[in-house]
Design a protein with these regions (language model features):
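Catalytic-core segments of nucleotide cyclases and related cyclic-nucleotide turnover enzymes
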Residues: 231, 255, 267-305
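Conserved metal-coordinating catalytic motifs of nucleotidyl cyclase and c-di-GMP turnover enzymes
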Residues: 141, 170-173, 215, 284
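A short pre-motif secondary-structure segment
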Residues: 209-212
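Forkhead-associated
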Residues: 35-111
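Intrinsically disordered, low-complexity acidic Ser/Thr-rich regulatory segments
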Residues: 1-59
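Short regulatory alpha-helical coupling segments
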Residues: 146-165, 197-205
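Conserved nucleotide-binding and Mg2+-coordinating catalytic segments in signaling enzymes
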Residues: 131-151, 172-185, 194
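Alpha-helical scaffold within the catalytic cores of cyclic-nucleotide enzymes
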Residues: 197-198, 229-250, 283-285
């Protein structure tokens, strides 16, 4: 984690022109949980924060709901202003209240998110979007990938451990998925994975981090959710999948419909203490395999242990 300097400096915009760059002004995230994302600066004022009403929403617990504001000056330069955030806005290692930005300048919000002012044309914007998607999303299901989850989990785990708030991790695995692949083929198996992903996504909150963890295993990170409510969430997902029909095409090209079940394991920071993030993941994985050994199509957590 980046150490936050204590001193604060202030610099007021002095009318320096934005320069001769063409294209749209954008903020590119070059460090932090949203790394790789690009946000177009198309309004006179743009709020950066983790609140739902922020213009640039960065879902990082170390960032305030309304953390900083970018303003366009009369000569089309950009000024970033801190909005009395808890963890501060930094420029070149110093905490700032207000600073003028030039093309290529970087500033930091919170403990680890670094943003860079740049100018992009439409082709560059699309390239940046595709680059971010390919780096963070699973190509088959459209869910976040394992690397993205681990990056987010590292930040969330540290925050929850410091502030004594709940964080739950649900691990799901499709029961007997190999039999689906063996009987119907891998194309059918992929169709099942994609449909199941959509079901889980629709049954989850906007702020929940859902990822394909590997193969037929999925993980959901639930911020500020205790063990009891995480177990209720996992049971709701399990029942919804058990009651659903999954459409697929068999090896001969004929349409088919099947049912399936999942098993789930839950670990919660707050209900138990974990020395490391790896211990936290291992606990959820342990409960997942307890559910498997107990007969599958069930959820296991620390409740009742």
């Amino acid at each position: 984690m980046t150490k936050l300097p204590e001193d604060t400096v202030t610099e007021v915009a002095s009318g320096i022109k934005a320069g001769s760059r063409t294209g749209s002004a954008c903020l590119l995230v070059i460090s932090g949980v949203a790394i790789g994302r690009s946000f177009k600066l198309s309004k006179p004022e743009t709020i950066v924060g983790r609140g739902d009403d922020a213009d640039i929403l960065i879902d990082d617990a170390a960032i305030s709901r309304h953390h900083a504001k970018l303003k366009v000056t009369s000569n089309k330069a950009f000024v970033v202003e801190d909005l009395d955030s808890k963890n501060g806005t930094f420029f070149k290692g110093q905490r700032v209240q207000q600073i003028l930005l030039h093309d290529g300048d970087r500033f930091q919000v919170g403990s680890s998110t670094i943003l860079k002012l740049t100018y992009q044309d439409n082709i560059e914007e699309e390239f940046q979007r595709q680059l971010y998607e390919s780096a963070t999303r699973d190509g088959l299901t459209g869910l976040f990938n394992k690397k993205f989850l681990l990056d987010r989990l590292a930040a969330e785990f540290a925050y929850c451990a410091r502030h004594k708030v709940s964080l739950s991790l649900c691990m799901f695995d499709i029961d007997h998925f190999k039999q689906i692949n063996d009987r119907w083929g891998h194309v059918a198996g992929d169709a099942v994975l994609a449909q199941l992903s959509r079901l889980v996504d629709k049954a989850s909150r906007t702020e929940d981090i859902i990822c394909r963890y590997g193969g037929e295993e999925f993980a959901v990170l639930l911020r500020d959710i205790d063990e009891k409510n995480a177990t209720c969430y996992a049971e709701r997902i399990r029942r919804r999948i058990e009651e659903s029909q999954f459409a697929l095409t068999d090896k001969d090209g004929s349409p088919q419909s099947i049912t399936l079940t999942i098993s789930g394991g839950i670990a919660t920071v707050g209900a138990a203490r974990f020395a490391t993030m790896d211990d936290f993941i291992a606990a959820a994985d342990k409960h997942l395999y307890q559910a498997k050994r107990a007969g599958r199509n069930r959820v296991s957590s620390g409740i009742g242990d």
